């Protein structure tokens, strides 16, 4: 099921430490001061960081209706996800992995302690 911008924003901001910010002059979301994601207004796609260019290429091949890239992102481990094709579970999965990579360890410990 397609996500609205409001639903996407609610999911992104549900991660501990997430806040609205800017990246290179564009509205974005960060965990503390580290880039988390952003919505590209040009094509209504969410910028998602992945572990490698190989992973990105696999995603592009496996789900071309959902994932794409532009020339700007060709040399980066980044994939663009079309918001109208993206579901909440998939988005949470990508964001959780990214959050674990960039959130300070103290924040991660505090967040995980709340789940117990």
Where are these regions (language model features)?
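Charge-dense, helix-prone N-terminal extensions
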Residues: 1-116
